[in-house]
Curated annotation (Swiss-Prot):
Residues 18-31 have a biased composition (Basic residues). It comes from Homo sapiens. The gene is RPL3. This is Large ribosomal subunit protein uL3. Component of the large ribosomal subunit. The ribosome is a large ribonucleoprotein complex responsible for the synthesis of proteins in the cell. It comes from the Eukaryota.
């Protein structure tokens, strides 16, 4: 029998088995940060949509490092995060077998984009979701029952979470069905949490009330789907020599004769991508404000810095490729994040106490690149492009036709 002479580490991790398509499109938070009653009441997660990537220039503040006080260029991802709307409150009690839902209370008014989430086919449905439930808020018996529910939640619950949804109409996406999730409320006593949640029923919660500048967060999402792939692409096994009979992008030995089965740990072809993943420790470089109207003027300069005073928005020329324009609040994260453009991402507060110097470093952005991401962009703004190009033929023709 021939065998290889040396052993080697296995290719690919078995920690992510089974490598199959994710059952859910929205990233699921499997554990929220530990509660600390001494802190003020706050939310622990938020939903955003991946718009695209660009790069920034910043000055490093790391005394003792070779790049201290020097400029570095870094890749960043823009995640659009319009305000989320709170539409419900859920109380949990702790049992020996984990958390159990105790009571769920929904708001009186729920928007259609949220109701769509409860239907497979909104167009053909009667659109009756929550019509009976909202009457609770209008008659006296219903109000008494709701007050009773809230008081029993204060008495018995240990964990309070809010049900919040995204606002799809604010985004440049075709989808109308909002994404809905439970977000844990941390900080303060249970009574304070419940009062905080009640005040915000049917209200919008912006991203800057959840996360702060220079904070380290975790990003949960589903990766880009790649379809059915061979073993070399999927597990990064070594290609066999050129003269190998019946193909070389294969595994040479898939196991012994007996046991007469292929072990689960052997690399095989199959689905690659569209897997649920959690990436920890993504640093927030900037929490940007969306377009706003001030004194009758539309303010767009959310990509200006103290060093680059040009009046420009975060959108590159021509918008983000395969996404469009970011007009709402956004979060700028260092490096890349999972998923394709338009993918919904769950941003969660870090589960760990951050102590490393890089995590606590203050970020001082000098420049944000807004050149076109479709080809080799060279202009930061349309004004800069027009000044360089001069009068164009199409402008002259349009002027002549207008005259």
């Amino acid at each position: 029998m021939s065998h290889r002479k040396f052993s080697a580490p296995r290719h690919g991790s078995l920690g992510f088995l089974p490598r199959k398509r994710s059952s859910r499109h929205r990233g699921k938070v499997k554990s929220f940060p530990k509660d600390d009653p001494s802190k003020p009441v706050h939310l622990t997660a938020f939903l955003g949509y991946k718009a695209g990537m660009t790069h920034i220039v910043r000055e490093v503040d790391r005394p003792g490092s070779k790049v201290n006080k020097k400029e570095v260029v870094e890749a960043v991802t823009i995640v659009e995060t319009p305000p989320m709307v709170v539409v419900g409150i859920v109380g949990y009690v702790e049992t020996p077998r984990g958390l159990r839902t105790f009571k769920t209370v929904f708001a009186e008014h729920i928007s259609d984009e949220c109701k769509r989430r409860f239907y497979k086919n909104w167009h053909k449905s009667k659109k009756k979701a929550f019509t009976k439930y909202c009457k609770k808020w209008q008659d006296e018996d219903g109000k008494k029952q709701l007050e009773k529910d809230f008081s029993s939640m204060k008495k018995y619950c240990q964990v309070i979470r809010v049900i919040a949804h995204t606002q799809m109409r604010l985004l440049p996406l075709r989808q109308k069905k909002a994404h809905l999730m439970e977000i844990q409320v941390n900080g303060g006593t249970v009574a304070e949490k419940l009062d905080w949640a009640r005040e915000r029923l049917e209200q919008q919660v912006p991203v800057n009330q959840v996360f702060g500048q220079d904070e380290m967060i975790d990003v949960i999402g589903v990766t880009k789907g790649k379809g059915y792939k061979g073993v070399t692409s999927r597990w990064h096994t070594k290609k066999l020599p050129r003269k190998t009979h019946r193909g070389l992008r294969k595994v040479a030995c898939i196991g012994a004769w007996h046991p007469a089965r292929v072990a689960f740990s052997v690399a095989r072809a199959g689905q690659k991508g569209y897997h649920h993943r959690t990436e920890i420790n993504k640093k927030i470089y900037k929490i940007g404000q969306g377009y706003l109207i001030k004194d009758g003027k539309l303010i767009k300069n959310n990509a200006s810095t103290d060093y680059d005073l040009s009046d420009k928005s975060i959108n590159p020329l021509g918008g983000f490729v395969h996404y469009g324009e970011v007009t709402n609040d956004f979060v700028m994260l260092k490096g890349c994040v999972v998923g394709t453009k338009k993918r919904v991402l769950t941003l969660r507060k870090s589960l760990l106490v951050q102590t490393k110097r890089r995590a606590l470093e203050k970020i001082d952005l000098k420049f944000i690149d807004t050149t076109s991401k479709f080809g080799h962009g060279r202009f930061q703004t349309m004004e800069e492009k027009k000044a360089f190009m001069g009068p164009l033929k199409k402008d002259r023709i349009a002027k002549e036709e207008g005259a």
